[in-house]
Amino acid sequence: KRALRNNYHKNAEWFGTFHNQELKGDVGYEKGVIRRDPTMVIQVDGLYYAWYTKSTGKTYGFGTGDPEKKVFPWDKSEIWYATSEDGWEWKEKGLAVTFGPKGEYDDRSVFTPEIFVHKGTYYLVYQCIKAPYLNRSFITIGMSIADKPEGPWERLEAPILEAAKDGKWLGEEDS
C-alpha cells in the first residue's frame, strides 16, 4: 500500500524491462551449486567482471534445530567472481570473499554483493550473517577492499552497517 500511496509505480526509475538470456561458459546451471545475486558488470582494461553469491549443498530451512544445517539457498555462501571478454561467455575465476573468523560478524555467510570503484580502488559490499542462524538474525553489511578486481580482497574488521536492535528507523521517510 505504501508503494502505491507514494506513487513508486509511476516512477520510471523503479521499473525496467529485462530479457532472459542463457549464460555461456562455466557459470551456468550446475547441479548442487547455487549462483545468484550478481553485481553490476564492470569493465577493466577490456575485460568484464561480475561477482556473485555462490553456495553448495542442500537447503533444510529452520525446522531442523541443527545449527550446522543450511537454512536458505544463500546460507553458508561465499562471494565468487567471473570474467568475460565479450560480456556473453563467462569464466568462473574463483573465490573473492569468504566467511570471517569464528565469532565475527560474518562467520556464517557472506552474500548479495555489489561492486564499487573509486579512484582505482575496488569495494565489495555484501550482506553478512553471524552464527548461529537458527532464526531470523540481524544481518550486517560488510566490506572488502582491493587494488585490482582480481583481489586480493581485504575484509574490514567491523561491519559498515548494522541493524538497530530495537527495530526503529532513524527517520520517518518511508517508514
Label each residue range with its predicted role:
Residues 1-175:
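Carbohydrate-active catalytic/glycan-binding domains of CAZyme proteins
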